[in-house]
Amino acid sequence: SAASDVYKRQAITGVKGGLIVIAADDPSMHSSQNEQDSRFYGDFSLIPMYEPSNQQEAYDMVYSGFEFSEKLGEPILMRMVTRLAHSRSGVERKAQKPQNGISFSEDPRQFILLPGNARKRYKVLLARQDEFIKASEESPYNKYTDGPNKKLGIIACGIGYNYLMENYPEGCEYPVLKIGQYPLPKKQLHQLIDSCDEILVLEDGQPFVEKQLKGYLGIG
């Protein structure tokens, strides 16, 4: 919360180099005084977000996330939750990448947020939202898995997907949309909505995806 003012402005200026901001949320307040959901910060900042479902995915997201951030020229928010942050697991490591060379912005004014510059930069950020959605639709962290029973479709976000699979060790009979990268992938979301009678949303925290889903459906 204390860093949100700077964070919002980083989204408007953009970044020159990779930047991942990791937020450790605490659903159910196991070791803090509130259970704020940091996904709302990423949403109002209009930037991409990661939400890993397990330790391997957390490693993979950080490994590829710096390159993704540098390619977009925007910071990436990565949301962790208590049960993932307070656990440990072996992960498959990847080869170390060489450090990219230093480069400088062609227009240094993008980092000077006087109102005239900020308005221009904000228009640039707004114009890139479809690009961010397309990146989510093509992301390996968002996966649609079909199932024979179309009475229910499940959207499982972050560690919620891990919880779901623990209850279906032999595979889930319902179609499942796993969410690990935001903004929500519209193509896969509509595929699930059009295929199923009802939708269940599994998310650890506040109803972030549920509210967006109601917006898509025009209810609530």
Task: Describe the function of each predicted region.
Residues 16-18, 45-47, 73:
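Short glycine-/polar-rich loops that comprise or flank the Walker A/P-loop
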Residues 23-24, 81:
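Histidine-centered beta-alpha loop that forms part of the nucleotide-sugar donor binding/catalytic region
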Residues 9-16, 27-44, 215-218:
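Flexible glycine/proline-rich, aromatic-decorated loop/lid segments
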Residues 24-26, 163:
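Beta-hairpin (beta-strand-turn-beta-strand) motif
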Residues 24, 43-51:
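Glycine/charged-rich beta-loop-alpha catalytic/anionic-binding loops adjacent to active sites
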Residues 52-220:
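Flexible, low-complexity linker and terminal segments
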Residues 2-7:
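Short, small-residue-biased leader/transition segments that mark boundaries at the very start
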